[in-house]
Structures are given as structure tokens and as C-alpha cells.
């Protein structure tokens, strides 16, 4: 009987420890529509901005200041239009020609339905870099040029009628984007002036789905 009792105690202790780890890994959360949390040089936003959006809760591992780790539990209806963009944002505040390098790194997982993982930067015009997507989603505007190689990655470029959008021809859940090279490609092509880079964000545009979308890590440096 004592052995059984000890085993039960040990099992309970293991479960309690596991639960403690799970809770402590997310030390801050919000269900507020525009809830945000400052983490080092980044601000993490819940950003539930679309029409007809459903509930969403943002969880943040507040120990991950150098490469934010956060996730959104979101339940969005199967209607058109982006409902939310939970993201990590960093202000760059340098002109395009002044930067020698600017790289966006990402590692993501999860998600069902219709969504796209993307960088969204303001230079000051909007420039998006899609890294992975699923379901009934697509960029604004129309195709401008296909199979453009920038910084070792091949993109299809969209613009007329919308922001400049660079969609990887080979989607990935983990990798990097040479943001400086993308901005300079636009400047050298006469598509942008040498503007000041404001915010660069990375996250997921959720159109529909009931799931958890996780940024295991991301950074812009």
C-alpha cells in the first residue's frame, strides 16, 4: 500500500510540475481587442481588427525578449477578410539607404483554416513578405513580377492596387527574409523613395479557423 501511495504521490507531483511549467511559460495574456505588451525592443499585439471577428486570446512568454515567443488561440468565422493579426513589432527608424542589413527571422507552427504568416513593414509605404499560408487567402492587387530572386529567396511580387507583397515561391515554417535587400530592390526599381523604415512586424493574418497559431521565435535585426 505504501508503494502504491508513493507512486500516486510521484505521479501527482509530475503532473503538478508539468502544469507549473506550462503556466510559467506564458506569464502574460490578454483577450483585449488591441491588447499589447512591450518585450525588450518589441511590442506584441493581439490586434483583432477585422469586421465580424470572433474571440482571440494572446499568450506571451515574457522571458523571450530577444526573439519573441507568443501564440494566439483564435476562433474566427468562415467569412471573407482578415480578422486579426497577432504580431511582434519593432521600430527601426532608419532610412533604407542607411541600413547595411536588416534580416527578419521566424519559426512558426500550428494553425488551421485560412491564414498567412507575414512580415508587414512600413517604409513608410506598406511592404509585406509572406512566408507561409493556407486556405482561401491571397495578396491585394495583382501579380507584378514572378520568380524574383532577392537575398537568396525567390518571390512572386504583387502590387497594382495594393501594398507591395512578396510571396515566397517555396513556403516554409522556419527561415529568414532579407528585408534590407527587398526594400533596396524597390528603391532601385523606382517603386519606392528612400523613406524611413518605421515598424516591421511579424505575425499571422487570420481570416478563418479555430486553432492555435504559435510564433516559436521571431526577430528583426
What residue ranges belong to the model's regions?
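Bacterial N-terminal signal peptides that target proteins for export
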Residues: 2-11
